[in-house]
From Swiss-Prot:
Highest taxon listed in the record's lineage: Bacteria
Presence of the UniProt keyword Metal-binding in the record: yes
PROSITE patterns: CYTOSOL_AP
Subcellular location: Cytoplasm
GO MF annotation: an example: manganese ion binding
Uppermost EC category: hydrolase
Physiological role: Presumably involved in the processing and regular turnover of intracellular proteins. Catalyzes the removal of unsubstituted N-terminal amino acids from various peptides.
Enzyme Commission number, as recorded: 3.4.11.1, 3.4.11.10
Full protein name: Cytosol aminopeptidase
Keyword flag Glycoprotein: no
Keywords assigned: Aminopeptidase, Cytoplasm, Hydrolase, Manganese, Metal-binding, Protease
Known cofactor(s): Mn(2+)
One GO BP annotation of this record: proteolysis
């Protein structure tokens, strides 16, 4: 499906459908008023019949409007003009797709006027991403081929010609971010018998072929891990026939404007049974999503390469599988991490932090200025923040504020939680430097405290996305979060100007 930006006369557009906004009390937007005048009041006469009130959720399809070349006009209710926010705007756009996608409509022109969502850049970007999200189809592994929509192209009409340049920039960014989000979702939604640690490494290597001028990939296999002393990482994968692979993706942009080295680490547990501390059977199938952190890092690197960001970015996909087997690590084991610190294992289902701790230590060789790890780490974070908000932890206030700012810009909500010294005491061990799990309280915080012990040499942030990375139930599947947030963080580091 293609997107286009242009400034046009709506009555002259030969298209299948023009979408315009109507507000409460049947107040027409400027675009709707223009079409109404061109049709000699035809739209007003139909609205007077009372079939649309302008409330959010209202839609009315008009056919063969006089003196209008478009085959249809879709009036979309937007509620009260001064109460439209990002959430309502997304709902409005979703309603338009619901009204259109089952019809034989291939080409659409959107002309949304009198809607104030920040500036034209954010208006266009949010439109494109919301429309793409509404049209996303989860990959199904079956022999049924169902076409979800006939839509081939969407044109966004820009009212003011002076806004065309920034609108085209917004479209470029939105399409790159959507590519990142869609790639993340598609990878996350794969079944674990297909997407295993080796498969993750193949996906990483594909990037070095597609973006050969900017991306280099190194794969760390179990032999190399042993040489490096990554014993915690290795231990997690010992129970599985699918051996661990760590993919190191190095992106180098052209004409670099920011000399900082930015690194992302993604937890890539392609399946997590819990190991010997086995999980309950109910919902265990969803543990294929325990690699959503790695998928998010993978997607974010795609965006950087698509937009040729003038940055140096490293992404690590920490691929592993936690299974029950005769070689599985056990509660009571003591592991020596790559950093030399020792960990007493009290629960084998607290495995993500063991994979991440060695990955975080490995990153030291690149002397990164910023490291952000992304992980479906703890159920405790879901208990604390629910399924709408990700947890944020950091050892650096400036980095934390930058992520919070990107969160506000993208409406991908995160919330900062503490790393006070009192929480570190929960990890005390009698026989090792510390244990891999606390005593049952503040689990998301103690998990972050564990990771913080391996991040002393750089500015670090941890995003716990256990509650936000996927949805359960009838419309289950990966959400693609927090990819847009991470992409926005990189755009901000790139000094892009939006207006």
């Amino acid at each position: 499906m293609n997107f286009f930006i242009k400034s046009c006369f709506l009555d002259k557009e030969k298209t299948d459908c023009i979408v315009v906004s109507v507000f409460e009390l049947s107040e027409l937007s400027d675009s709707a008023i223009y079409l109404d005048k061109c049709s000699n009041g035809h739209i007003t006469s139909l609205i007077k019949l009372g079939d649309i009130q302008g409330k959010i959720g209202d839609t009315l399809m008009l056919y063969k409007v006089p003196k209008i070349l478009s085959k249809r006009i879709l009036l979309v209710g937007c509620g009260k003009k001064d109460e439209i926010n990002i959430i309502r705007f997304k709902k409005i756009l979703k309603n338009t797709i619901h009204a259109i996608k089952k019809k034989s409509i291939t080409n659409i022109v959107y002309s949304f006027s009198n809607i104030n969502i920040d500036n034209i850049y954010w208006m266009i970007r949010r439109m494109v991403l919301s429309l793409k999200e509404s049209l996303y189809e989860t990959i199904k592994i079956n022999n049924i081929n169902i076409k979800n929509t006939n839509i081939h192209s969407i044109t966004l009409n820009i009212i003011k010609k002076n806004d065309l340049f920034i609108a085209k920039t917004a479209l470029k960014h939105a399409l790159a971010i959507d590519h990142a989000i869609t790639s993340t979702k598609n990878l996350s939604n794969l079944p674990p018998n297909i997407c295993n640690p080796l498969y993750l490494s193949y996906k990483a290597q594909e990037l070095s072929k597609k973006y050969e001028n900017n991306i280099v990939v190194e794969i760390i296999d179990i032999k190399k891990m042993k040489e490096l002393g990554m014993n915690a990482y290795i231990a997690v994968g010992n129970g599985s026939k699918n051996k661990p692979f760590m993919s190191v993706i190095k992106y180098s942009g052209n004409n670099i404007v920011n000399k900082k080295i930015i690194a992302f680490v993604g937890k890539g547990l392609t399946f997590d049974s819990g190991g010997i501390s086995i999980k309950p059977a109910l919902h265990m199938h969803e543990m294929k999503y325990d690699m959503c952190g790695a998928a998010a890092v993978y997607g974010t690197l795609i965006m950087a390469a698509e937009l040729q960001l003038p940055l140096t970015v490293i992404g690590i996909l920490s691929g592993c599988e936690n299974m029950v087997g005769s070689h599985s690590f056990r509660p009571g084991d003591v592991l020596t991490t790559m950093s030399g610190q020792t960990v007493e294992i009290l629960n084998t289902d607290a495995e993500g932090r063991l994979v991440l701790c060695d990955s975080l230590t490995y990153l030291e060789r690149f002397s990164p200025d910023i490291v952000i790890d992304v992980a479906t780490l703890t159920g405790a974070c879901v208990t604390a923040l629910g399924e709408s908000v990700s947890g944020l932890f950091s050892n650096n206030e400036e980095l934390s504020n930058q992520l919070l700012h990107a969160s506000q810009e993208t409406d991908d909500k995160i919330w900062s939680l503490p790393l006070f010294s009192e929480y570190h005491k929960e990890l005390n061990s009698d026989i090792a430097d510390f244990s891999n799990i606390g005593r049952g309280k503040a689990g998301a915080i103690t998990a972050a405290c564990f990771l913080s012990k391996f991040t002393k040499k750089y500015n670090w942030a941890h995003l716990d996305i256990a509650g936000t990375a996927w949805k359960s139930g009838k419309k289950s599947g990966a959400t693609g979060r927090p990819v847009e947030l991470l992409c926005q963080f990189l755009l901000n580091q790139s000094n892009y100007i939006y207006n």
